[in-house]
A protein has these predicted regions:
Chain B
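Membrane-interface interhelical loops and short amphipathic "cap" helices
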Residues: 32-57, 108-130, 189-212, 239-242, ...
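Long, contiguous internal "core" modules enriched in hydrophobic/ aromatic residues
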Residues: 6-13, 17, 21-27, 81-83, ...
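TerminUS-proximal long segments
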Residues: 306, 310-385
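Hydrophobic alpha-helical membrane-insertion segments
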Residues: 20-28, 96-103, 178-179, 317-326
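Aromatic-anchored segments of alpha-helical transmembrane domains
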Residues: 101, 185-186, 261-264, 321-331
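Hydrophobic alpha-helical transmembrane segments
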Residues: 63-71, 222, 292-299, 363
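N-terminal signal-anchor module of multipass membrane proteins
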Residues: 1-68, 72, 338, 365, ...
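Transmembrane-helix bundle segments that line or gate the permeation/cavity pathway
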Residues: 34-44, 49-52, 59-159, 173-188
Length: 303, 385
């Protein structure tokens, strides 16, 4: 038995050495679809009517809101999307004045950004979240185990959770109206309803072109930044603003996609399981060596 | 062989075990609420702070503190230092109990407990959590397999299956021993990878792409101190001999492992320039100072002295500081350092979360005592020459 074990370990060592050549030479590559849809939100146009919230609620069959959608006093405090509302509109006063010298509000619609290389998708343990070819970051409740790693990973803190469901809680976030767009060929609920065309739906590349054209045509009206163009490697939802983004609730984000570092670590260490196999072989060889040595010592004693 | 594990002959029902029962009952009651009112009913978790102490302490610290299992297995079985076999069984028991409770903590923390098997079939290979889950799942199994001989020694005559498995394992145990070390290295490091995906949320004092390496080296470092701490507690509460003849030499290895961890950690801090915020008095920097100062630097210097390594009290103190330091490190990474920029209020653990955690710890102590009373785990007392 002992001898055969050594032979086996030797074979294992060879196997480990062969596997120890990882193909980690290839650098990390973005998995973003080439021509995703997107939405361009122009904050200079938004009038804060909350119609997009209402449309989203109806299209996605969400529960009745606590306060009716025509009640604008909800904007007195900052809100975040939650499990009952996939999008909310917040109001900011940045010191900007209107043409009658009164403080002018800026309204900001918040929802999932549908990142090009989403942290949530990379993190999800079961692949319940996926980036679709049309740009949607899609949630499949059938696979979800409720670990909430997507929530810990999302830089925009978007996925919301049904914390008061004891057995079957779901992760809730803007669906980009996936079925509506993909199967019915319609606009997302929010984009279709907006009375002032603050939300433009289209191919992300076209939207970026439009956004820069608007800035170029009226440089006094806009800050020269399309939020979402490069943030976290790019998002499908893009924003134009007349005031500094930092003043209306947008945080500065790295331009590297969030999953880049972790995915590089994971694939470098575990492609073809080379490192565990190599370690197993090395430890096996070591164990074989030490047990032979201690056995021969025992033999000496016996003699 | 110098060691000869025997069941401990000590009365089982003591005031201590009764206190543990009380904590266990409180924890169990909280779980009833958890499965009646949801996570929101008993925790302070919210959309910005989705992970609390059940992940930061029960899972992350739990995994780290079970490192005594694979580090002693490596020393005694793989390196062949049979002298240390006296502590492999208690370390194995702690690891098996620890990991079993890590799995239970995950089960309770995930919203859809009934779906816990799903990652086996729906695999996402870019997810560090997927790797942690697979390794922990496999490792729990491996640990209990490694424990079978202990069970068989006591029950083999009554349960033929155990005796049968024991005989098979006699020839194959080396596979499981190596597998245990490999799996430990994998998931100890992947546990550190988890929050690398959230650079905007983790404080720069802890955020580094080196987190996986730091988690791995700190797991190496905490292994023997954990064995020293638990053996000292067990031998003194069960009135056994102190086993200092094993623990003192064991502590010498920690000078190296803890030293490597300290060097990596301080080097990383300096390279990234993150030490700049160290004295700003924020909860983060204070917690970092305690973690590194009391948990790493001071005990490392203590261990340099032979008088400390030979004194039961001082060695216990140093080991306890290292154990506390690594626990605090996991807690810091997952809870203290985690700041969600969009959050409107911070996270503090709710009483329900604390009760469940305390209940889990009490159950581990309770079961440990139960096992050492029934099964041949500890070899103290008759081990002296
Ligand atoms: S915003 Fe968050 S939830 Fe939405 S795709 Fe990006 S990472 Fe995922
Ligand atoms: S909570 Fe669900 S969707 Fe989110 S990471 Fe976990 S399994 Fe994936
Ligand atoms: S795209 Fe659809 S789900 Fe998302 S905010 Fe608009 S209406 Fe709601």
């Amino acid at each position: 038995m002992k001898v055969s074990r050594r032979v086996f370990l030797g074979n294992l060592g060879a196997l480990g050495a062969a596997a120890a050549v990882p193909d980690n030479a290839r650098a990390w590559e973005s998995k973003a679809p080439p021509a995703p849809y997107g939405c361009l939100v122009d904050l200079t146009r938004c009038v804060g009517c909350r119609k997009c919230e209402q449309a989203c609620n109806e299209v996605n069959k969400l529960p009745e809101p606590e306060m009716p959608f025509d009640d604008l006093t909800v904007m007195d405090r900052l809100r975040r999307p939650d499990h009952r509302s996939y999008t909310v509109v917040n109001r900011y006063y940045t010191g900007r004045l209107d043409d009658r010298d009164r403080l002018a509000p800026t309204f900001v619609k918040v929802q999932c950004m549908h990142c090009q290389d989403p942290a949530c998708v990379s993190a999800c343990i079961t692949g319940a979240l996926t980036k679709k070819e049309n740009g949607t970051v899609h949630y499949d409740v059938e696979k979800c185990i409720g670990c909430r790693y997507c929530m810990a990973a999302c830089p925009f803190e978007i996925p919301a959770y049904e914390y008061h469901e004891p057995i079957t809680p779901r992760v809730r976030k803007c669906t980009f109206c996936y079925e509506r767009v993909e199967q019915e060929g319609k606009l997302p609920g929010c984009a279709s309803i907006c009375p002032v065309e603050a939300i433009t739906f289209g191919r992300r590349n076209d939207l970026l072109g439009q956004a820069h054209a608007r800035i170029d045509n009226d440089p006094a009206k806009y800050v020269d930044h399309v939020y979402g163009e490069n943030e976290v490697g790019g998002t499908s939802w893009l924003y134009l603003s007349g005031v500094s983004f930092a003043k209306v609730g947008f945080h500065e984000m790295p331009t590297e996609p969030m999953p880049k570092v972790t995915e590089t670590i994971q694939s470098t260490m575990f492609s073809y399981l080379w490192s565990p196999i190599a370690l197993f072989a090395a430890l096996g060889a070591l164990m074989g060596f030490t047990s032979r040595r201690s056995r021969s010592k025992e033999d000496d004693h016996d003699a | 062989m110098t060691h000869d594990p025997k069941p401990v002959k000590a009365p089982f029902w003591t005031p201590g075990t009764l206190v543990m029962l009380a904590f266990m009952a409180a924890g169990a009651l909280t779980l009833v609420f958890r499965y009646t009112f949801g996570l929101g009913g008993v925790t302070n978790l919210n959309n910005h702070y989705p992970w609390g102490i059940w992940i930061g302490l029960d899972v992350a610290s739990g995994v780290a503190l079970a490192a005594g299992g694979f580090t002693t297995a490596f020393l005694a079985h793989i390196l062949g230092r049979h002298y240390y076999e006296a502590v492999t069984r208690p370390a194995l028991l702690t690891a098996a109990l620890g990991y079993t409770f890590v799995a239970i903590a995950v089960f309770v923390d995930i919203g859809r407990s009934w779906a816990i098997w799903k990652p086996i079939f729906y695999q996402n290979h870019t997810s560090a959590l997927f790797e942690v889950a697979m390794c922990v799942m496999t490792y729990v199994t491996v640990l209990w397999i490694e424990f079978i001989p202990v069970l068989a020694e006591r029950l083999g005559s009554r349960i033929p299956l155990l005796a049968f498995l024991d005989r098979i394992l006699d020839k194959t145990m080396w596979i499981f021993i190596i597998l245990g070390v490999v799996l430990s290295c994998m998931h100890q490091s992947s546990l550190g990878t988890l929050l690398v995906i959230a650079p905007t949320k983790v404080s720069p004092l802890w955020y580094t792409p080196m987190l996986p390496l730091l988690f791995l080296t700190s797991a190496f470092a905490v292994g023997y101190p954990m064995v020293i701490a638990e053996t000292t507690i067990a031998t003194s509460s069960l009135r056994l001999e102190s086993e200092m003849n094993v623990l003192s030499p064991l502590s010498r290895f920690t000078i190296l492992t803890l030293g490597v961890y300290m060097a990596l950690k301080l080097g990383d801090l300096i390279m990234r320039g993150a030490y700049a915020t160290l004295l700003d008095g924020s909860p983060q920097s204070n917690s970092f100072l305690v973690e590194m100062g009391l948990g790493v630097v001071v005990p490392w210097f203590m261990l340099l002295f032979g008088t400390v390594r030979r004194s039961r009290r001082l060695l216990f103190a140093a080991a306890l500081m290292i154990v506390g330091g690594v626990m605090l490190n996991r807690f810091n990474v997952f809870v203290v350092s985690f700041k969600a920029p969009y959050a409107t209020e911070p996270y503090y653990p709710a009483i329900g979360e604390i009760l469940v955690t305390a209940g889990a710890v009490a159950t581990i102590f309770f079961l440990y005592r139960l096992f050492v009373t029934w099964f041949p785990v500890l070899s103290a007392r008759r081990q002296e020459v």
